[in-house]
């Protein structure tokens, strides 16, 4: 199974485009650009890859549409955005078991197969935007739970996601819709 993906973008110019480029000399950090905004971002612990695999810790090199969003109640206050944001509940999980039929899909507890909890003790998923990596065209073992979320202190590496500081996420959110494309170069 090949996990790389060619992206052909024949969309209209009115679609918001975010570009993420590796920061000079830093494998796990990036500069996220949206129009005139240039924001510091965290990447996966293995940097960027063209051949994403489950558990490799890499951020996929791809163009991904922002398809849905979640938020942790109360932590970030009111958020202005063009995305529909659902509040994260205690029973919300994300399946990361490649052999399971619900692979790379949201699921509810109790759930026996390998999964990630969306209610975290840290702030990472205070805002959690699902990017269309391996969702619309799902392939087992090609990576799951590739999100656009809040960064750890010091922009420590993610498990393959793209992450911003809370202030920068709040700054960018008003411009985002379900037509926004995020490109990792």
Which residues are covered by each model-predicted region?
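A conserved hydrophobic position in a structured secondary element of the catalytic/binding core
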Residues: 164
């Amino acid at each position: 199974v090949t996990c790389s993906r060619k992206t052909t973008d024949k969309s209209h110019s009115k679609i918001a485009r975010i570009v993420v480029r590796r920061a000079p000399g830093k494998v796990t950090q990036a500069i996220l650009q949206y129009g005139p905004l240039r924001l510091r971002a965290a990447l996966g612990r293995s940097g960027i890859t063209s051949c994403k695999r489950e558990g490799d810790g890499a951020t996929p090199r791809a163009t991904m549409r922002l398809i849905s969003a979640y938020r942790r109640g109360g932590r970030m206050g009111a958020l202005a955005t063009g995305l529909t944001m659902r509040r994260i509940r205690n029973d919300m999980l994300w399946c990361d078991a490649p052999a399971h039929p619900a692979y790379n899909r949201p699921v509810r507890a109790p759930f026996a197969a390998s999964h990630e909890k969306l209610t975290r003790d840290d702030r990472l998923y205070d805002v959690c935007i699902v990017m269309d990596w391996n969702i619309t065209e799902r392939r087992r073992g090609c990576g799951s739970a590739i999100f656009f979320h809040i960064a750890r202190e010091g922009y420590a590496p993610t498990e393959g996601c793209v992450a911003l500081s809370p202030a920068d996420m709040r700054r960018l959110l008003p411009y985002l819709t379900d037509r926004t494309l995020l490109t990792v170069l």
